[in-house]
Amino acid sequence: MRMLPQDLHDYDDVAENYDLYLDAMYSNEDNHAGFQDFYLDFAKEYGKDGVIDIACGTGAVLLYLAEHGIYADGTDLSEAMCRVAEEKAKAKGFNLSIFPANMTEFKSARKYSCAIIARSGFMHLLTPELQRAALLNIRENLSDGGMLTFNTFDPHPFFQAQQMNTKDTDYSFRLEYTNKQGQREKIYNAISYNPYTQIMSGNWKFETLDDNGVIIEERIRPVKMRQTYRQEMKYLLEMTGYEIVNIYGGYHKESGECSAKNVIWCVRKK
């Protein structure tokens, strides 16, 4: 099933702490405020014949939907993430179908009227060929007129220039949080950018601290994501049989006409 090298989200330690450090991250960054309600509204509007949460991670959207009466299927490339999501679902009393699969090739026994790729899930497809394969495969799993939503962001020349001169060991502090074991951890990022492949690659460094602030463990986890320009995304959607219904600049349905940290695509199977 796995076609890509091991990534940040494949590691057990990342999966078990994913919700904890994202909570800390989102409390300091406003570009994800309201993301669960956006997907709940999307599922309510388009999910009458079934919803699938692709790249579901540990279930932030999947379980939020279930808590509001929408029982979606969930899939993720990371077996570790699926395992955590399933444990959380069972703890809440939900019997959901959650399975590890590659979005470029998964097959479901049913069709869905609504597919969700939340947050950065689509951006982990590292080539146009993989993006095309995913869009075509998702289309095959959608019913006629089915809807898909996914995110990109508008590449910024200033940050691209910075990252073109950054090595994967040039770490900068990102956040501090308390891990599952109750220990303080600091996270550092080092991201470089290749303008020819449009891929951001680098490492996340996790430092675990004791009660005196002394580092007692350090873990390096790799990560890669691809930047996609709107023009190429529009062409790719046209080639793969989708029509664009809306493009938003944020989870509160801000105008998508200006440059945005979150470009949220809402597209329909033609």
Where are these regions (language model features)?
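Conserved class I S-adenosyl-L-methionine
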Residues: 1-55
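A short glycine-rich, Lys/Arg-flanked "PGG" loop and its adjoining helix->strand segment in the class I
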Residues: 132-144
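A short acidic, Gly/Pro-enriched loop at the edge of an enzyme's catalytic core
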Residues: 107-114
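A conserved beta-strand element that flanks and buttresses the S-adenosyl-L-methionine
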Residues: 116-118
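Class I SAM-dependent methyltransferase SAM/SAH-binding core
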Residues: 59-105
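C-terminal lobe and adjacent flexible extensions of AdoMet/dcAdoMet transferase-like proteins
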Residues: 224-270
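SAM-dependent methyltransferase
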Residues: 150-234
